[in-house]
Amino acid sequence: MFKMVSSPHTHSGKLTAHIMLWAILAMMPAFFTQIYYFGFGVVLQSALAIGTAIIAEFIAIKLRGKKPLNYLSDFSVALTALILAMAIPPYAPYWIIIIGTLCAVLLGKQVYGGLGQNPFNPAMIGYVILLISFPLQMTTWMPPINLLQEPPTFSDAFSLIFSGLTTDGFTLSQLTHNIDGITQATPLDSAKIFYKSHTQLNDFYELIKLPIFMGNGTDFAQGWWQINVAFLAGGIFLILKRVIHWQIPVAMLVTFFCLATATAFTGFTHLSAISQLVSGAMMFGAFFIATDPVTASITPRGKIIFGALVGLFVYLIRYHGNYPDGVAFAILLSNICVPLIDHYTRPRVSGYPTKGRK
């Protein structure tokens, strides 16, 4: 006798653990690029995040009466922790990443029943909670370490994260005192300050002469565009490996680029559209966060609509909101719309009566 099983009867052969490991591997170019430009802080933040995430997930699954090792072996919690660790300032206090990781794992994932049940991206839940609750710590960024007279060593990074001082007793602001201009803000922050208030910089060309930009007349942000290109390379790798689909990142980036380009013709002073694409978390969000298979749309047309919606929200927040980046908020707002998008884009079952026909 044959045993009857439910569909699907064929599958891609990709296990969840394999997908998560491919995603982690694809993040490594950006991970090492971030170390090169911003120091060892991201290494320590990642270790703290992954350790906290594993402990939190273990306890949560144990309390639900299930076997933790069966769930931890899919590496999804490690990917969530790594995404959050790479999204926060590298030298944020240790308790920032611990709180954010606990919120991501417990409030963003386990409270809904675990992997596959959460409607919102867990890492972005943790990030947004941190950004709203601790805005100072979450917006204090060190400029690229090649601009510093004394770049922080691994020991300095450890000391800064756990005590707020380097091994020589210097604070983060004291390390950057020799750099002119805005030193503890991202280039997107600097541009936002510029076009909202002309009292800080006389004209846009003075802005892009700041050391945090390339200093050659372009508005590409030093360190940031290299990290975004690394995320782009990793994202293309995931598409070629068929770990993610192309529709979401392409729709997101094209929508944002078109809106940003159109805005440039209105005289609304801001960074160029191309510079916007390689600033902040744009490529990170497009290829590694918005493409989360659990919280994104599942239909081909729905993926395009979802990606375009994320791009629209990023544009609205960056150009007209109070936050300089907006990728995290854009993804969470778009996650809300996923059930509606899937409802209207799901293909009809063969033989199902269409509207107006009996």
UniProtKB/Swiss-Prot annotation:
It holds the Pfam family NQR2_RnfD_RnfE. The gene is rnfD. The keyword Secreted does not apply. This is Ion-translocating oxidoreductase complex subunit D. Part of a membrane-bound complex that couples electron transfer with translocation of ions across the membrane. The keyword ATP-binding does not apply. Belongs to the NqrB/RnfD family. The chain crosses the membrane at residues 24-44, 79-99, 125-145, 220-240, 248-268, 271-291, 297-317, 321-341. InterPro entries: NqrB/RnfD (IPR004338), RnfD_bac (IPR011303). The complex is composed of six subunits: RnfA, RnfB, RnfC, RnfD, RnfE and RnfG. Its cofactor is FMN. Its main location: membrane. The modification FMN phosphoryl threonine is found at residue 186. It is an enzyme of class 7 (translocase). Keywords: Cell inner membrane, Cell membrane, Electron transport, Flavoprotein, FMN, Membrane, Phosphoprotein, Translocase, Transmembrane, Transmembrane helix, Transport. It comes from the Bacteria. It is a multi-pass membrane protein. It is found in: Cell inner membrane. GO terms for biological process: electron transport chain; transmembrane transport. Signal peptide: none annotated. Its EC number is 7.-.-.-. One of its GO terms (cellular component) is plasma membrane.
